[in-house]
Curated annotation (Swiss-Prot):
CC terms in the record's Gene Ontology section: cytoplasm
Gene designation: pepE
NCBIfam families hit by this protein: PRK05282.1 (NF003642)
EC number: 3.4.13.21
Alphabetic keyword roster: Cytoplasm, Dipeptidase, Hydrolase, Protease, Serine protease
Origin organism lineage: Bacteria, Pseudomonadati, Pseudomonadota, Gammaproteobacteria, Pasteurellales
Top class in the EC scheme: hydrolase
Name of the protein: Peptidase E
Organism: Actinobacillus pleuropneumoniae serotype 7 (strain AP76)
Length: 234
């Protein structure tokens, strides 16, 4: 059974890196102390893989996990195949997916997660768990072989969702951008995840975690609000 924790971002309000996720992760990984976590660092454009690995190791030290970046393997997918848990960090979703294709990780991750290996990711790491990355917020744009992602959660995800416009901002709001996506892709569902929220996926059910509701948009911006602590079939 799939077991995934998809988190909107690495920070919430003024909290330090990944601090707000620790209670969720402690419960999610309660049975995995001392186990090996394969970490995928490809989204980290402004830091090296070594730096990203160390940052995550330090942030999650209290969970007592063995966190190993996939770049430590002779073949990156070797680390995935040896792991007890898979984690994908945030950053640039285009760079992340491009390198996941280059290192042949998608099928390996998909097979492991469908067989029950826990998966957690934040921001870009949540985005690639969805059907495609076409509702990412990111620049720079690099070109992966396809925008199709892991499809472990078979819908679109939009992390860091903010409703409305800032004063003086004359570009599109997030709702307007998602409306345009749904005009072009009317069969899609988009799960808009505000800061400080997460989806805990267990099999074919999802539970909303955090301090805010998650918004599900469909054709013509029909809204289905997923309330905090609610569980739904997807």
């Amino acid at each position: 059974m799939k077991n995934m924790l998809l988190m909107s971002g690495s920070k919430y309000k003024d909290t330090a890196y990944l601090v707000h996720t620790l209670p969720w992760l402690a419960q999610f990984l309660a049975d995995y102390k001392g186990k090996k976590v394969a970490f995928v660092p490809y989204a980290g454009v402004r830091r090296s893989f070594d730096e990203y690995e160390t940052t995550v190791q330090n942030a999650l030290q209290s969970l007592e996990l063995e966190i190993v970046s996939v770049h430590r393997g002779k073949q990156h997918r070797d680390i995935i195949e040896q792991a007890d848990v898979i984690a994908i960090g945030g950053g640039n979703t285009f760079c992340l997916l491009k390198q996941m294709y280059e290192h042949d990780l998608l099928d390996a991750i998909r097979a492991k997660v469908n067989s029950g290996t826990p998966y957690f990711g934040w921001s870009a790491g949540a985005n690639v768990a969805g059907s495609s990355i076409m509702t990412t917020n990111d620049m720079p744009i690099t070109y992966p072989p396809s925008f199709n992602a892991l499809n472990l959660f078979p819908h679109q995800i939009n992390p860091h969702f903010i409703s409305g416009k800032m004063q003086g901002h004359n570009g599109e709001s997030r709702e307007e951008r998602l409306e345009e996506f749904l005009i072009v892709n009317p069969q899609s569902l988009v799960y808009a995840m505000p800061e400080g929220t997460a989806l805990h996926i267990q099999g074919e059910q999802a539970t909303v975690l955090g301090a805010q509701d998650i918004l599900c948009f469909s054709e013509k911006m029909q809204l289905d609000t997923k309330a905090v602590n609610s569980t739904f079939n997807y």
